[in-house]
UniProtKB/Swiss-Prot annotation:
Organism of this sequence: Bacillus anthracis
Protein name: Calmodulin-sensitive adenylate cyclase
Gene: cya
Keywords: ATP-binding, Calcium, Calmodulin-binding, cAMP biosynthesis, Host cytoplasm, Lyase, Magnesium, Metal-binding, Nucleotide-binding, Plasmid, Secreted, Signal, Toxin, Virulence
Coiled coil: none
Domain ATLF-like span(s) in chain numbering: 60-273
């Protein structure tokens, strides 16, 4: 069996003559003249050579992006014959196909069994071939699946000896690109439209390119082609284009098109000489527009963020200095001026929710029925318990105080339509002003004497907890700042911090770094760098007051808080805990994220998808350290939220392979439910830690998901992850083959093996490697030492 390898050749082969100078004593040629002539020729030759290299590289890139090979027993000759079909069409056609999101499969699997064709409808299976015939699907050797993105499946054959079959392949390729050229969403090319009209007047041309059904429709419509006729007969227009495409590019059929449909031949000739390139460029431009990230920038972004402008200006200096992206969750805009005035912000020791209505808006009411959870019995009960718990457990640090509103705050709430200042009333000789809101349960008033706000239940109304009461002070949660209890409002929640890798490297002691980088063994060096980045950049530890953070994240929080205090803020800290990246218990999904980039620019994304795309384009796609919340794409253990997040690199759900901790947790869960260990007759409670295979798998999974791999170059930075994934796969294979494994675990390990296969294949594809995962696995020898095996692995990947 030949080695399963797809080797792209040149798109076109240009013959070059090398000038040979035969200089003899009888030739009267000046040396300088000869040198001048040689230099000019050499420049031209080198220019052509470079151009040829560029064409070859472009063709190779087009192939790598498009073609997937699937075969087990075909010869390299047949693969080459199949590949040669693509060499006969311009690279721009392949680029059009690529821009449409298309894929091409070379396979020796029968089309009826191919995975990409299992969801075809009967109508799709009976689509026309190039002769306008509906043939049995089982007899197809090439098929174009038309959905949102085209997929072309081609059986590996010796197409060089069968011109009809090669023409059929070109017809199906033509169908793929016709999805864009002739689309219901686009205006038909006027030149092509006029061409169809002229072809309908020529019997030879129409007989060659139109189906009988289409010719009859044209006759019934008096050969009048308007927008409605095009929409009703889109498939027929696409068929005519695809058929002309096949005649033009199938070498043995080109003269037929030139003889019987010369106008169409000329049209195809124009496309080949520049038309396809224009279409490709147009699609690329559309792709840029489609991928454009819709954001607010500058002052608009800042205003929409809710951050105090002076604080944001202080933060951007830090972002510049530390070459770090600082991402914030949106701040309650009713809290912005409170923070600016010196109101304290809540940390992790207060779990009550803030309010977004009535006079308490922006604060955290002790009575949670005044919060944004108003009217929700369970949430109010839980919030009230949380507030009481905070005061009890953090006595002296957390308390409650009466709510006071000054004139400026009342005016701000009035401007936002939250309250209205109503009529004056006298109660026990004291003057109050009613504060009107849209609430149906409570009435509010403010004391003219001390600005304290009170509330009571309206006549005939009861609270969600079944209470009814007269005027009482509204109390809000407060924090002790330098001996004074200050009311609390929402803090600045960090969504993420993404420092440059050079900043993380500064955290590593120079002696430790030098010891690792001077290691001669490349794999050991990469492992060493990875371990240093884990230790100093990624390793995070729980903190009782700030949540889960790494050392550099703690330093960043200190820098941010000091910068705010320098602006004159007197409320203590404004950033009180770690990022949303580590909020795995109670994750939250925000439509808007405020970003300060390392250039000090303000940016606000407008939806969750745009946030992901921004991170992909500007952070994970460059040399910045970033990791995702591991609770995404699963039910969070705390608030039971399900938040979907797609990995910008692999385009896959990020939890497709478990982490080391999740792997052990899954095994423990099976053990608890079955009361059986991984291995038969195992009564050892600590077997997970002692069994070598389980330890190895856990270690490989830990290395696989290590964000520190981003320290390496773009070309190599995913290689370690791929290699670790393959190592985990191999160890799982060993476990499954073992006769000692308990049957209760077999399904889990099989499932895990499939997950690894799928995700590693995605990484291979992103690496632009043409090799299939299982084929790569077979070429590695796991009985060799790890370093030698890794070198073999790198060589295979680089060749592909």
């Amino acid at each position: 069996m030949t080695r399963n390898k797809f080797i792209p050749n040149k798109f076109s082969i240009i013959s070059f003559s090398v000038l040979l100078f035969a200089i003899s004593s009888s030739q009267a040629i000046e040396v300088n003249a000869m040198n001048e002539h040689y230099t000019e020729s050499d420049i031209k030759r080198n220019h052509k050579t470079e151009k040829n290299k560029t064409e070859k590289e472009k063709f190779k890139d087009s192939i790598n992006n498009l073609v997937k090979t699937e075969f087990t027993n075909e010869t390299l000759d047949k693969i080459q014959q199949t590949q040669d079909l693509l060499k006969k069409i311009p690279k721009d056609v392949l680029e059009i196909y690529s821009e449409l999101g298309g894929e091409i499969y070379f396979t020796d699997i029968d089309l009826v069994e191919h995975k990409e064709l299992q969801d075809l409808s009967e109508e799709e299976k009976n689509s026309m071939n190039s002769r306008g015939e509906k043939v049995p699907f089982a007899s197809r050797f090439v098929f174009e699946k038309k959905r949102e993105t085209p997929k072309l499946i081609i059986n590996i054959k010796d197409y060089a000896i069968n011109s009809e079959q090669s023409k059929e392949v070109y017809y199906e390729i033509g169908k793929g690109i016709s999805l864009d050229i002739i689309s219901k969403d686009k205006s038909l090319d006027p030149e092509f439209l006029n061409l169809i009209k002229s072809l309908s007047d020529d019997s030879d041309s129409s007989d060659l390119l139109f189906s009988q059904k289409f010719k009859e429709k044209l006759e019934l419509n008096n050969k009048s082609i308007d927008i409605n006729f095009i929409k009703e007969n889109l498939t027929e227009f696409q068929h005519a284009f695809s058929l002309a495409f096949s005649y033009y590019f199938a070498p043995d059929h080109r003269t037929v098109l030139e003889l019987y449909a010369p106008d169409m031949f000329e049209y195809m000739n124009k496309l080949e000489k520049g038309g396809f390139e224009k279409i490709s460029e147009s699609l690329k431009k559309e792709g840029v527009e489609k991928d454009r990230i819709d954001v607010l920038k500058g002052e608009k972004a800042l205003k929409a963020s809710g951050l105090v402008p002076e604080h944001a200006d202080a933060f951007k200096k830090i972002a510049r200095e530390l070459n770090t992206y600082i991402l914030f969750r949106p701040v309650n805009k009713l809290a912005t001026n409170l923070i600016k005035s010196g109101v304290a912000t809540k940390g992790l020791n207060v779990h009550g929710k803030s309010s977004d209505w009535g006079p308490v808006a922006g604060y955290i009411p002790f009575d949670q029925d005044l919060s944004k959870k108003h009217g929700q019995q369970l949430a109010v009960e839980k919030g009230n318990l949380e507030n009481k718990k905070s005061i009890t457990e953090h006595e002296g640090e957390i308390g409650k105080i009466p709510l006071k509103l000054d004139h400026l705050r009342i005016e701000e709430l009035k401007e936002n339509g939250i309250i209205l200042k109503g009529k004056k009333e006298i109660d026990n000789g004291k003057k109050y002003y009613l504060l009107e809101s849209n609430n149906q349960v409570y009435e509010f008033r403010i004391s003219d004497e001390n600005n304290e706000v009170q509330y009571k239940t309206k006549e005939g109304k009861i609270t969600v907890l079944g209470e009814k009461f007269n005027w009482r002070n509204i109390e809000v949660m407060a924090k002790n700042v330098e001996g004074v209890l200050k009311p609390l409002t929402a803090d600045y929640d960090l969504f993420a911090l993404a420092p440059s890798l050079t900043e993380i490297k500064k955290q590593i002691p120079q002696k430790e770094w030098d010891k690792v980088v001077n290691t001669p063994n490349s794999l050991e060096k990469q492992k060493g760098v990875t371990n240093l980045l884990i230790k100093y950049g990624i390793e995070r530890k729980p903190d009782s007051t700030k949540g889960t953070l790494s050392n550099w994240q703690k330093q960043m929080l200190d820098r941010l808080n000091e910068a705010v205090k320098y602006t004159g803020y007197t409320g203590g800290d404004v950033v009180n805990h770690g990022t949303e990246q580590d909020n795995e218990e109670f994750p939250e999904k925000d439509n808007e994220i405020f970003i300060i980039n390392p250039e000090g620019e303000f940016i606000l994304t407008k939806n969750w998808e745009m946030t992901g795309r921004f991170i992909e384009k500007n952070i994970t796609g460059k040399d910045y350290l970033y990791y995702f919340n591991r609770s995404y794409n699963k039910i969070a253990p705390g608030n039971k939220a399900y938040i979907e997040w797609t990995d910008p690199i692999t385009k896959a759900k990020i939890n497709t392979i478990p982490t080391s901790a999740e792997f052990i947790k899954n095994l423990s869960s099976i053990r608890r439910s079955s009361n059986v260990g991984v291995y038969k007759d195992s009564g050892d409670k600590d077997e997970f830690a002692k069994k070598e295979s389980v330890k190895k798998i856990a270690g490989y999974l830990s290395d696989y998901y290590n964000s520190a791999n981003h320290i390496f170059s773009q070309e190599k930075k995913r290689k370690i992850s791929i290699f670790r994934g393959i190592q985990a796969y191999n160890e799982i294979e060993n476990v499954l083959k073992s006769k000692q494994i308990a049957p209760e675990y077999k399904n889990y390990f099989q499932y895990l093996k499939e997950r690894i296969t799928n995700q590693v294949q995605l990484l291979l594809t992103h690496q632009k490697s043409n090799i299939e995962f299982k084929l790569l696995y077979k070429q590695l020898n796991f009985t060799e030492n790890e370093t030698d095996n890794f070198e073999v692995f790198q060589k295979i990947i680089d060749e592909k």
